[in-house]
Amino acid sequence: MEALLQQSRAMCPFLKRSSPNTLRSLATATRPSTSPGGGTMTNLQRIARRCPVMSKALAVQSARMTGTKRFTSSAAGVPGAGAGTPKPTRGSPGKRALHSTGGNGANMSTEFHKGAQQIHPGLSNATRSHVGASATVSGPTPRAPVAAPFDYDAFYNAELQKKHQDKSYRYFNNINRLAQEFPRAHTASKDEKVTVWCSNDYLGMGRNPEVLATMHKTLDTYGAGAGGTRNISGHNQHAVSLENTLAKLHGKEAALVFSSCFVANDATLATLGSKMPDCVILSDSLNHASMIQGIRHSGAKKMVFKHNDLVDLETKLASLPLHVPKIIAFESVYSMCGSIAPIEAICDLADKYGAITFLDEVHAVGMYGPHGAGVAEHLDYEIYASQDTANPLSTKGTVMDRINIITGTLGKAYGCVGGYIAGSAALVDTIRSLAPGFIFTTSLPPATMAGADTAIRYQARHQQDRILQQLHTRAVKQSFKDLDIPVIPNPSHIVPLLVGDAELAKQASDKLLEEHGIYVQAINYPTVPRGEERLRITPTPGHTQELRDHLVEAVNTVWNDLGIKRASDWKAMGGFVGVGVEAAELENQPIWTDAQLNMRPDETLEAAVEREFQAAVPGMKAGGAKAKPVGSIAANPIGASIPVAAAA
């Protein structure tokens, strides 16, 4: 009681200046209430009614007591109390009536209900007698509240119905990629094989012999799982080695591995944004959901700048005081349109306005740069090409060196799973120590980390896969352009075909799969804005000329069958998202130059592809892979065969 009084005095000036004797006297002296039927009141209550805080508390207390009295009267059988109120049923009309799917209410069985009344054998005798007496008290039981409970199933069904109505419901195709027949897969039936044209395993590293051998050996030695979080038995030599490799790849002091890059982005932005005082995060309008989620979780102020718009970004930076901490969050390659950020110019703005940069290289690591470190490395290609690995001493001032935080994935070009951040030792240690997304989750399995480490080292030594993938991408884009099929212009390895309608995109994807044995996933809202629906194609080193010809022929047929707009149609309408806009074509030249792709003067694209593919064959044999074609395309009308990817 004394502790409660001390706490109350700290909050209330009246209690603070009144002595205990005065309070006791006021609390015991009573007089009739001024309210009809209000009984008596203490003098302390009368004084409290004049207090702006206590008067509200007393009003709430009075309302609760009144409600309790009414409920007790109804339970005691007072005539008219609660009479005529129908008992709610799950089958009654309401939200559920809006849906075609119905359901029967779940009823508790009588036997189960009886069993629930039994007294636990562990109770003491005194407690048994008390519980028994309480259970046998005669009289009616209180009625349940008259309001109907929330209909959870109706809520779920309503949300799903919205997705169906706007054609954004996501369907999942059963696609089982075959390691020895890359880029082939079988569907739910092993006899039904298709060619996968939308995988993010961009280089086929998911079936690379060196990676698989490392994973097999590690799995046999160290088992399936890590055994715990990084702090509790889940930290091991594989994590240490992988993080050292990643830090070296990006020329940073340290790196930290997460279960995915979604978690890495979310955890890092949420932690920095919430811990830095008055932090402001400036985010590109096309940023990935993981970054948007992290910014939201941070609670920091957010400013969204127009996609790749340096003027808009600088305007927003200039509006903020120099002393305020600022994070510019953006991506190098935007995966759904293939655009590439002006990284160096953003670094210039960050330096000018006292901001730090957060660069997501998820769709670029393994794909760009002499060692596969991403677009930031690629922008200084010649400097890094002369290095065995990124050397911080000799690469000071390069674009990659200027980036404060780099995030990437192990699950796309490296063919495994997981995500990471790389930066200064102080930054990485801060995230390691404060980010719940890192602290409270199980570490990646040893075999996964060892496999990813091997994949990164492999791609740092070999340019062949990146070059072949880029040549195949050029060939596919050119073939579509020749047939007036609308490719959204971009300088990267992404091939987005504009459809512009959610239902048509789904139909096109279905027809390619069912009639041509080609798997390309439709991309709809919210991944892309409504009206910008598309098919997203990602060539790999394993997509040979026969496979490319089959794809282009099939897409052309589907476009004709469904009457989907051609590039010339979009041009006649004034152009859209770069399609049908000549300036957009000129501005989006490939980031890989002819010289970087080892193309010879006057050499045709197909000749360069064939030469690079043949150059990859000895390496494939040395890696233990078959150099000759394996498997056949069951649904391919041209009867092509699939060679093992050069990535092997």
Curated annotation (Swiss-Prot):
Q: Which GO terms describe its cellular component?
A: mitochondrial matrix; mitochondrion
Mention any Pfam family matching this sequence.
Aminotran_1_2
Q: Does the keyword Transferase apply?
A: yes
Q: Which domain of life is it from?
A: Eukaryota
The GO biological-process annotations, alphabetized, read as: heme biosynthetic process; positive regulation of organelle assembly; protoporphyrinogen IX biosynthetic process
The active site lies at 412
- The EC number(s) this enzyme carries: 2.3.1.37
- Name the pathway: Porphyrin-containing compound metabolism; protoporphyrin-IX biosynthesis; 5-aminolevulinate from glycine: step 1/1
Q: According to its UniProt entry, what is the function of this protein?
A: Catalyzes the synthesis of 5-aminolevulinate (ALA) from succinyl-CoA and glycine, the first and rate-limiting step in heme biosynthesis.
User: What PANTHER family does UniProt report for this protein, alphabetically?
Assistant: 2-AMINO-3-KETOBUTYRATE COENZYME A LIGASE, MITOCHONDRIAL (PTHR13693:SF102), CLASS II AMINOTRANSFERASE/8-AMINO-7-OXONONANOATE SYNTHASE (PTHR13693)
According to UniProt, the name of this protein is 5-aminolevulinate synthase, mitochondrial
Look up and give the organism this protein is from: Emericella nidulans (strain FGSC A4 / ATCC 38163 / CBS 112.46 / NRRL 194 / M139) (Aspergillus nidulans)
